[in-house]
């Protein structure tokens, strides 16, 4: 699998707290990593519609978390957008 336990721990340690994996920044970073991986997969496999649907669902989940973070703490929202280079 492309996302190992070590890679998840690394992502959570960089963007949030290694112990608190439910933190919005960590979840957004994890979704961003998965989205970039699926995007690369879809460039090679254009007719993989199941993966395309999964990508759309992940983008929606990330968008919902970003909206939540924007509503709760605008400074954390702006920081995660800048760090992950998510266009807005």
Swiss-Prot record:
A single MF term (Gene Ontology): rRNA binding
Which keywords fit this entry according to its UniProt record? Ribonucleoprotein, Ribosomal protein, RNA-binding, rRNA-binding
Q: Which SUPFAM superfamilies match?
A: S15/NS1 RNA-binding domain
Q: Which GO terms describe its biological process?
A: translation
One Gene Ontology cellular component annotation?
cytosolic small ribosomal subunit
In terms of PANTHER family, this protein maps to: RIBOSOMAL PROTEIN S15, BACTERIAL AND ORGANELLAR, SMALL RIBOSOMAL SUBUNIT PROTEIN US15M
- Similarity comment text for this entry: Belongs to the universal ribosomal protein uS15 family.
Give the record's subunit note: Part of the 30S ribosomal subunit. Forms a bridge to the 50S subunit in the 70S ribosome, contacting the 23S rRNA.
Task performed by this protein = One of the primary rRNA binding proteins, it binds directly to 16S rRNA where it helps nucleate assembly of the platform of the 30S subunit by binding and bridging several RNA helices of the 16S rRNA.
Full protein name: Small ribosomal subunit protein uS15
What is the protein's species of origin?
A: Flavobacterium johnsoniae (strain ATCC 17061 / DSM 2064 / JCM 8514 / BCRC 14874 / CCUG 350202 / NBRC 14942 / NCIMB 11054 / UW101) (Cytophaga johnsonae)
Lineage, opening ranks: Bacteria, Pseudomonadati, Bacteroidota, Flavobacteriia, Flavobacteriales
UniProt gene name: rpsO
